[in-house]
Amino acid sequence: MKKILLLFSICLISMLGYAQTNEDGKESVYIDYFSRPGSISNILAEALRNKIIEGIQEMNRVVLIDVDSNEALKAEARRRQETSAMGDVVARSEAMTTLGAKYLIQGNITSMQGIKKTDSKGKPYYKGSVSYTLKIVDPSNGTLKGTQAFSHEGLTGSIGDTPEEAILKTLDYAKISMDDFVNENFKIQGTIVQVESTKKDKAQTVYVDLGTKRGIQKGQKFTVYIEMDIAGELSLKEVGRLNVKEVLSGARSLCSVSKGGEEIMRATKEEKKLVIISRKDTFLSL
């Protein structure tokens, strides 16, 4: 009876909830509570989760919804903690799907430590070390879309006077790492609509049909592909790379061509469709 009432409440809430994709084409993604060992406090676990939420939100790529903001999901989470309901993930998946979630982000925290060190003068301090894994799941069928493990320690571990301070400072790296996480798992696709400037038959800058509505920001990187028909099947061939130079409007951005200017120019003259797909930043990337 409780389960029937819960699902009925969720159905009512869904009338006012989010669709799987909003009018700007952004996918609705719920972020669940994170699992953790008993040795890790809830305060530190929530601090990590909040930093991850901040990092994803700043990318503005998806409509991110915290399950903690939805009373039906909070109630369902409490229900799962009852002995009779432990391990029942079906109802939770049903809840997510009914509420319009395209994907669900789940987190599992492996460790959060402040490792004691001593400086050259013999003074003790602590170095943060945080490890966790994020999974992206399609709640409609349980399919795993992607998974990524993170470890912030060493050069990405911060220093503190206490273990807790070192851990909390290290969490800033978790926020920063969400840029690549979003670019890797929530790719965005568009097209080159016009070549803006050229030099010696090479495209130098181009306009693309993506802007603020899809969360595009200055510095975003794209891979450029030519759309080809091979024996009746559409295929993509990589021909270049772009960097967003300026976001002009909701649906337009100016990009500099960092690779493949000649191929892009040739394809434009031949009126071939040039598809762009977002990519994550790398240390040596153009």
Residue ranges, per PLM feature:
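Positively charged n-region of N-terminal signal peptides that target proteins for export
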Residues: 1-4, 19
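C-terminal segment of classical bacterial N-terminal signal peptides
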Residues: 13-19
